[in-house]
Amino acid sequence: MNYMRIIFKKFKARMIVGCILAVIALLAVSVIVFINQASFGRTPRGERLERVMKSPNYRNGEFKNQHETLLMTSDRGRFSGIWEFIFRKIDGLRPEQAVKAIKTDLRKIGRNEEILVWFGHSSYLIQTGGKRILVAPVFCMASPVSFVNKPFKGTELYTPDDMPDIDYLVISHDHWDHLDYNTVKKLKDRIGAVICPLGVGEHFEYWGFDKERLIELDWNEDANLAPGFMIHCLPARHFSGRRLTANQSLWASFLLEAPSQKIYIGGDGGYDTHYAEIGNRFPGIDLAILENGQYNEEWSLIHLMPQYMAQTARDLKAKRVLTVHHSKYALAKHRWDEPLKNAEEMKNKDSLNVLIPEIGEVVALEK
């Protein structure tokens, strides 16, 4: 009897261990299958990887910022910071009412009109010199899963179908809130060329874009787009990654030189010396589009903090400023409308020419 009991206990223990191992194996397989979906893109390979490895900005197996940059700046461990970020409650994190927005028929805007339309967060359309430039369009999902990073009520006015034919798509880095797989796939046949930092082109090639349509640049490289149009790829202080391995593609800001406009496309990034260097190298910037929102003291080196926004605009010597990266998603622990107050303060207290349009409002570009 005791012998049978011992056998049963051993069998039960083995069953429990077997079940645990089976669950772990199932979870591992599920994660592998999940991160191998097309939307996660692909890390550089072949000739592109060779070019990446030759970049002066790629060292010790990853792209680096110009100066040492910690992702988390506090003394606490990363797990502690993530735990607080997930569970700390903030009043006003999301708006109680729908965000004000305007539905503009973009296809009816004449090609010769010099305008900009912001779609919330970091998505906007620039039209200048008869060219249409679409920056970081995110109209479907800002994360790998639909239930994370849900847009605020009222901000989902625009879809890929609302976009006119696009001459140039500009992507500053490959994070999900700047590079939306479903959006770019739906726009694929209506985009002339893609402008992106080194390594990001691998995602687009994987998603079916012809290599000839990819203008993939390292920092301080440029490309002639058309007569009177030049794009300069410039530094930013940030990081990259859609998969488990970070910093395998570059992040960047861009300077667009058009016949009647000089526009700085800031992307994401913390304050550093590159802003003053860009301002000196490219005098007469007509419009600087800067990050404002989704910041946190924990990430103060990789996102532009409010206390540095006015100084950044001055460093760039920009005639006008538009702030983005806000009013659509809650990706950091601050009130949803705090970035709007930051912009108002830059305008009123710092006496800067700051544009504060509603989502979908047509903004005239000064010639």
How would you describe each model-predicted region?
Residues 152, 211-214, 230-233, 307, ...:
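Short, hinge-like loop/turn segments at secondary-structure boundaries
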Residues 126, 136, 173, 180, ...:
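Divalent metal-coordination and catalytic microenvironments
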Residues 176, 200-201, 221:
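Alpha-helix capping/helix-boundary segments
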Residues 16, 27-47, 51-54, 58, ...:
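Cap/insert and terminal regions of metallo-dependent hydrolase folds
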Residues 204-218:
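Helix-loop-beta element that forms the nucleotide-linked donor phosphate-binding surface
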Residues 84-164, 182, 216-283, 359-367:
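Core dinuclear metal-dependent hydrolase active-site scaffold
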Residues 54-55, 148-196, 283-289:
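Active-site metal-binding motif and surrounding structural segment of the metallo-beta-lactamase
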Residues 2-143, 148-150, 159, 261-265, ...:
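Metallo-beta-lactamase
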